[in-house]
Swiss-Prot record:
InterPro entries according to UniProt: Ribosomal_bL33, Ribosomal_bL33_CS, Ribosomal_bL33_sf, Ribosomal_zn-bd
Any matching Pfam family: Ribosomal_L33
Family that this chain belongs to: Belongs to the bacterial ribosomal protein bL33 family.
GO cellular component assignments: cytosolic large ribosomal subunit
Record flagged with keyword Chloroplast: no
Family annotation (HAMAP family): Ribosomal_bL33
Keyword annotations from UniProtKB, A to Z: Ribonucleoprotein, Ribosomal protein
Lineage: superkingdom: Bacteria
The protein's name: Large ribosomal subunit protein bL33
Stored Gene3D superfamilies: Ribosomal protein L33
Keyword match Aminoacyl-tRNA synthetase: no
GO molecular function terms listed in the Swiss-Prot or TrEMBL record: structural constituent of ribosome
Organism: Tropheryma whipplei (strain Twist)
One BP annotation, GO: translation
Length: 56
């Protein structure tokens, strides 16, 4: 079954704001979160929790 072009749950990259270049890959619901996501997650390079922002 083919996916729709404008998927309701697209795959997005979350990049660390600490400047380490570490990324997480996740899905988001466009209807609930139309803006860019900002989450606090663990960055193993600096061994701390930092903000991760959605990349486009």
């Amino acid at each position: 079954m083919a996916r729709k072009r404008q998927d309701v749950r697209p795959i997005v990259k979350l990049k660390s704001t600490a400047g380490t270049g570490f990324t997480y890959v996740t899905r988001k619901n466009r209807r609930n979160d139309p803006d860019r996501i900002v989450l606090k997650k663990y960055d193993p390079i600096i061994r701390r929790h930092t903000e991760f922002r959605e990349e486009r």
